[in-house]
């Protein structure tokens, strides 16, 4: 069953500059020409033979002479796959097996994401959100936060620091509002207490004013009646 070519390999081949290489022309049949050098005498003797896309199992088999352009495609694909294998820590044998199968190169990780993919970025955001919650960021000191951020990306570190600063400012503003509200309630309670005291004092002043008027009226009657007139015992009632 024929396997489709790897999109990653084809993209690399499309970006590969072939103009700097000379295409080897094969002599046509029946035309005399210089003998063609075998692959054993070329610099590519260490490269395994090029497999066909329709027969991936023929990598190690001996094949006939191929056109130069197909060899360049094969070398570009092999170099790209082997370079990806070395970057991922794969051995040359594993890279060759991946090349034979024409499958995507796996990436080490808990979910097998590709580097820089949206899935990997989303998983990293989730892990950091679980590790650095809002409460943890607020209670954490700057030194502790810098120590915890070692190994994180620069963008993630800046985002978490900005998040902590925002939470700190928000908490400070909320604390100020709560303090002002508490002071306002205290002042309103004090105002109500003083108003009640003022009303009580006004009532007391009114009572004293009535008593003053009563005593003044009695004094006026005593003054108008003159000395020795009548029995003054009624003044003490």
Swiss-Prot record:
Which keywords fit this entry according to its UniProt record?
Activator, Cytoplasm, Developmental protein, Disease variant, DNA-binding, Isopeptide bond, Nucleus, Retinitis pigmentosa, Sensory transduction, Transcription, Transcription regulation, Ubl conjugation, Vision
The cellular location(s) given in this protein's UniProt record come to: Cytoplasm; Nucleus
Record-listed cross-link Glycyl lysine isopeptide (Lys-Gly) (interchain with G-Cter in SUMO), residues: 20, 24
Posttranslational modification: Phosphorylated. Disumoylated at Lys-20. Sumoylation modulates the transcriptional activity of NRL on RHO and NR2E3 promoters, and is required for normal rod differentiation.
Region Basic motif: list its residue ranges. Answer: 159-185
Q: Which residues form the bZIP domain?
A: 159-222
- GO terms (BP aspect): positive regulation of gene expression; positive regulation of transcription by RNA polymerase II; regulation of transcription by RNA polymerase II; retinal rod cell development; visual perception
Q: Which GO terms describe its cellular component?
A: chromatin; cytoplasm; cytosol; nucleoplasm; nucleus
Q: Name the PROSITE patterns for this protein.
A: BZIP
Superkingdom as given in the UniProt entry: Eukaryota
The annotated consequence of residue 50 to P reads: In RP27; decreases phosphorylation; no effect on subcellular localization; increased transcriptional coactivator activity
Q: How changing residue 122 to E affects the protein?
A: In RP27; uncertain significance; alters phosphorylation; no effect on subcellular localization; no effect on transcriptional coactivator activity
The answer, when asked if Repressor is one of the entry's keywords, is no
Region called Minimal transactivation domain (MTD), residue ranges: 30-93
What one GO molecular function would you report for this record? Answer: DNA binding
How does this chain assemble? Answer: Interacts with FIZ1; this interaction represses transactivation. Interacts (via the leucine-zipper domain) with CRX.
Disease listed for this protein: Retinitis pigmentosa 27: A retinal dystrophy belonging to the group of pigmentary retinopathies. Retinitis pigmentosa is characterized by retinal pigment deposits visible on fundus examination and primary loss of rod photoreceptor cells followed by secondary loss of cone photoreceptors. Patients typically have night vision blindness and loss of midperipheral visual field. As their condition progresses, they lose their far peripheral visual field and eventually central vision as well. Retinal degeneration autosomal recessive clumped pigment type: A retinopathy characterized by night blindness since early childhood, consistent with a severe reduction in rod function. Color vision is normal although there is a relatively enhanced function of short-wavelength-sensitive cones in the macula. Signs of retinal degeneration and clusters of clumped pigment deposits in the peripheral fundus at the level of the retinal pigment epithelium are present.
| Domain remark in the UniProt entry | The minimal transactivation domain (MTD) is conserved across the MAF family, it may activate transcription by recruiting TBP and associated factors at the promoters of target genes.
* Known function: Acts as a transcriptional activator which regulates the expression of several rod-specific genes, including RHO and PDE6B. Also functions as a transcriptional coactivator, stimulating transcription mediated by the transcription factor CRX and NR2E3. Binds to the rhodopsin promoter in a sequence-specific manner.
What this protein is called in its record is Neural retina-specific leucine zipper protein
